[in-house]
């Protein structure tokens, strides 16, 4: 896992090279859902490029491709509470948002599985999604229920979302948030057949829901 920064690709490749030099040959890499379909988004393109490296460098690797993090809603919770608007453009196709707790548990399970394997396991990619496919209207309805006051969906305008994000993050990062949101609006972020069932089976429990986070943020 490496941060979304201007030198993210350098960080990823340096880390993998140093790991190989240290004799580490089993890794779990945190990529992003549909990394290969949104390569115009810089931090998606970086992760898609880095996904190629484990096999090239001879690692036994699991590549995790999580959907949009539910936890990122902390960045916009104040807007929801103070202005009664949910600002992220996610349209009517929906996004299978995922909780970071589920991501970390799946990552730990995969690290342990590879560590305990008698030999190198092949490179494998796992989509990590949440229990529900949520549209803008769905999310606004959850916030309405949790806060006890009507919350409107702000609409499918990535440009407005960029302007909002630029109030508390660097302009280049706010722009990335805009072009990241564009495929949410055009295509959604939809799980594939069997994704959810596989994830529930791995830790042996239900996945955390968006409503859990909304309840925590409402306080």
Task: Describe these PLM feature segments.
Residues 1-2, 28:
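N-terminal Rossmann-like NAD(P) cofactor-binding module of classical short-chain dehydrogenase/reductase
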Residues 5-7, 17-26, 33-152, 163-172, ...:
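Oxidoreductase cofactor-interface core, primarily capturing Rossmann-like NAD(P)-dependent enzymes
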Residues 9, 97, 204-207:
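A generic "functional-site adjacency" signal
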Residues 28-29, 215:
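An N-terminal domain-start capping segment
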Residues 31-32, 188:
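Short secondary-structure boundary segments
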Residues 121, 159-219:
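A hydrophobic C-terminal alpha-helical subdomain
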Residues 156:
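Acidic/histidine-enriched alpha-helical segments
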């Amino acid at each position: 896992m490496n941060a979304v920064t201007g030198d993210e690709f350098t960080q990823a490749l340096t880390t993998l090279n140093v790991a190989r030099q240290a004799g580490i040959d089993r890794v779990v890499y945190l990529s992003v859902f549909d990394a290969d379909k949104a390569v115009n988004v810089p931090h998606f393109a970086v992760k898609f490029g880095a996904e190629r490296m484990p096999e090239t460098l001879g690692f036994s690797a699991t590549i995790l491709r999580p959907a949009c993090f539910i936890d990122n809603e902390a960045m916009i919770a104040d807007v929801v509470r103070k202005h009664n608007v949910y600002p992220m453009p996610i349209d009517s196709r929906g996004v299978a948002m995922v909780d970071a707790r589920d991501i970390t548990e799946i990552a730990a399970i995969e690290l342990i599985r590879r560590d305990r394997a008698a030999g190198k396991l092949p490179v494998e990619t796992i989509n990590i999604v949440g229990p529900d496919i949520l549209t803008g209207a769905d999310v606004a309805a959850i916030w309405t229920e949790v806060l006890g006051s009507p919350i409107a969906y702000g609409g499918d305008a990535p440009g407005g979302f960029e302007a909002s994000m630029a109030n508390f993050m660097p302009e280049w990062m706010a722009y990335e948030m805009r072009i990241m949101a564009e495929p949410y609006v055009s295509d959604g972020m939809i799980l594939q057949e069997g994704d959810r069932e596989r994830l529930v089976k791995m830790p042996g429990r239900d996945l955390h829901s968006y409503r859990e986070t909304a309840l925590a943020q409402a306080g």
